[in-house]
Each structure stands twice: as C-alpha cells, then as structure tokens.
Curated annotation (Swiss-Prot):
Signal sequence interval, chain numbering: 1-22
EC number: 3.4.16.-
Residues carrying a glycan: N83, N134, N309, N350
Annotated family: Belongs to the peptidase S10 family.
Keyword Signal on entry: yes
Protein's job: May be involved in the digestion of phagocytosed particles in the lysosome, participation in an inflammatory protease cascade, and trimming of peptides for antigen presentation.
GO molecular function terms noted in the UniProt entry: serine-type carboxypeptidase activity
Protein name (database record): Probable serine carboxypeptidase CPVL
Active site: S206, D390, H450
GO biological process: proteolysis
Entries under SUPFAM superfamilies matching the protein: alpha/beta-Hydrolases
Amino acid sequence: MVRAQWKVIILLILLMVIPSDGLFHSIYRSILVAQPFKGNAGQPLFLSPYIRTGKIKEGQRKSMVSPFPGMYDKSYAGYITVNQTYNSNLFFWFFPARTQPADAPVVLWLQGGPGGSSMFGLFVEHGPYIITSNMTVLSRDFPWTFSLSMLYIDNPVGTGFSFTDHIQGYAIDEDDVAQDLYSALVQFFKLFPEYAKNDFYITGESYAGKYVPAIAYYIHSLNPVRRFKIRLKGIALGDAYTDPETIIGGYATFLYEVGLLDEQQRRHFRKQCRKCIKYIKEQEWMKAFEVLDELLDGDLTAGPSFFQNVTGCTNYYNILQCTEPEDQSYFSKFLSLPQVRQAIHVGNRNFSDGAEVEKYLREDTVKSVKPWLAEIMNYYKVLIYNGQLDIIVAAALTERSLMTMDWKGSYAYRRTHKKIWKIFESDDEVAGYVRRVGKFHQVIVRGGGHILPYDQPLRSFDMINRFIYDRGWEPYKL
C-alpha cells in the first residue's frame, strides 16, 4: 500500500517536471434537476455583453466562482450567448490548471448523449470535485485539472444549464453544433485572452465522438480565413460514436461473443442492424433511428428496448455492471442547491436532461462524421481510446471503424501492432494497449468501461497527460 502511494506521488511530480517532447442516454435521463431548492440562487450571468463592449476584467471578475465548502480551486462560470435572435446560450465552467496555469494547454470537454451535461464529466469523471450522497464535496485524487486547464461546456444548446428561448435555437445537425460551439470558444478566448496563446485540445466521449470532430473541422476550416485563430493542436475521443453505420454492423457478433445474446437473439439483432444500415444507406435517417432505438437504446420507445429485455440490464456502459452506479447521479441534487447555483451564476435556470436536444438530433443520430475525423487525423494529434469493458462502443467496434478510415496513415495503421502500456516499469498490472502511427494514438484501457475516468481514474489521468504532453508510452522508472 505504501509503495502504491509513493508511485502516485512520483507520477504527480513527473507531470510537473518532465518537459513536453443520447443516443447513449439512459445514464443522463436519471439526472434531471427541473427546479432548484428554495433559497436565493442569484441571477444568471450573461457574459457576452462584457465581451462585446471590451469590459474584459469586469467580465472575468463577475464570472469567478464563489468559494463553497470543499470547492476551493479557482474557477469561472457563466453563460455565453451564441445566437441573439433566439437567445441561445451555452453554459461553461472553466478551471485553470493547478500547476503552471499560464502555460498549461486548455482542454475543452464535451459530454455525449446527445443531451448529456458536461457537469457529469466534471463531477463523475475527471473534474477536481466529487459529490457524496450527503452533498459533501470531496477532492478527486487524479483530476485532469492538475495539469490541464479544463473547460466544461454544456453542449449543444438545451443541454444541462444551456438553453434557448426558441425551438429554432436547437441544433438539428453537427453543423449547428459546431457553429454554436465556435461562437462560444471565440468569445471565451476573448474573455480570457491570457489563455488564447496556449495549445488547445478538444475532448469528449460517446456521442461527443460527433461533436469533437465537428467543431475541430470547423476550426480547421475557419482558422486560415479568420483574424482570430484558435490554437488547435489535437483532439481526444473516448468510446466515440463517430461512425454509426460501421459500429452498428458489428453489434450482433460482439454481443453474442461476450455472452449477452444467444444464437436466436443474435439472428434477430443482426437482422435489425442490417435493416438500420439499409435505411442509413438510403438516407432514411428517422427510420434508421427508430429501428436502433427499439433494438438497443430505448430512449424514445414506450417500453424497454430489445437489448434491455433479453439481458435484463439497463446499463450498456460496463459489461460487469447491469445497472448504473448510484453515485453517478449525486451531483444533480448538488446542482439544485441555491448556494451552488448562486456560486456558478446560473440562478433559477432549469437543468435539463437533454430530452429536447435528442428530439431535434434524431436524424443526426445515425449520420457519420468519419470524413471530418479523417481530415483532422491528417493534420493534428488524435487520441482515440476505449474502455476494455464498454458495450455500446466497444473497443472491437472502434477498431472495426478505424480499419475503414481513409487518412494519410491508414496503410501504416493496418500493419501496426499494439504494444503493452504500463504506467510504471515495476507495475504488475498492465494499464492497457497502445497502437501509434505518427500523431495518431489508439488506446484500449484495461478494467474500464464507457465512463472510463470513473472506472479507471489513474490510468485515464496518465493516458491524457502522455498524449497531450507528448511523453510517449514507455513506463516510468522509479
């Protein structure tokens, strides 16, 4: 035990001193904070007027999050207006890195869903705080904010604390998502110009496997022609639903081989998946969505999905867990507390479960962004990672998609073998497996599921820092 604790301490020291060289919706549907508890929640803070009028210091000062018992990291939060016509606003919460914040890369985190709040990533996965059942705030052992400046945005409009006053303010495709995010990012870096010079990475998991390539491609396209440039260096995608057609085509075999379907159930699953793919090829997007929803997701159906009926499980994020862990929803009650809402400047705004967001993105659900991802892989650093125990976007399904990708390194990728990754040379346990081709890194993390940093916090922490700080995948020596 003592030796293990020393390894953790050494890893943190290494990070400071080594130079750099919706669809998946069930977990979010249980997280609904319709109204705050009674009390003074203050008023929502809209920062775009301060940005437009050049009142940057005042905007920064007003957006600073007030101290709350257990929450002592310096942070900023508020709303950025991305469409004045429809009064569409994206909520953000920004944490400068604990170490060397002036130079640390800025990392945007986007949750999946569609319609999952990035507050889930903050409180459940890799932010500085954990919420207990009695609303106590604890410090996370391996927060990504230790070495990275983390920007959490509730995306798209209508997700979490983000909102719009008009139905036309909702995104109906990834172009809409990217356009709103780009507006928010440009305004964010104008509000915090001291961070605009830092390297910028876009990260996310699950359905954000669409959001991340979409906004990255948008930045890639606009940077050459815009005066204000975002210093995009790379992206990281966890268990990413980037390429639905290819992923859906592998479900029946995968679920059968891990023992979740019998032979008859596999035949039904395969038949329905083929029907879904047929609709995708015919661009019958709504029909494809309905087939997949009845088969697997059960988000908008009257009863359980076929998957839920035959497995008895509602959780397809970890093969070892039939239901979602209870502690993954504690933060929702915390965000109802008026003193918390006042501290993060959201006032009495509803915290949405994202059902409306998914409704407007139903056709987008089965569309691919693979061409955008391939373009990003040609020019930027890219990390694609999977938890070994994930079901909904299993490692085998990600690899199935990657084998069909057309990018500059595709020939080399298909002929490159994965290598063993350990954090420390003396570790008995293997952290995972890595396949690297140039600036592209594919990682499978052992012992983790879809919500990877929750299942494997240290391995996720080590992985993201190795990738962003270009430290390679050789084990550290004690």
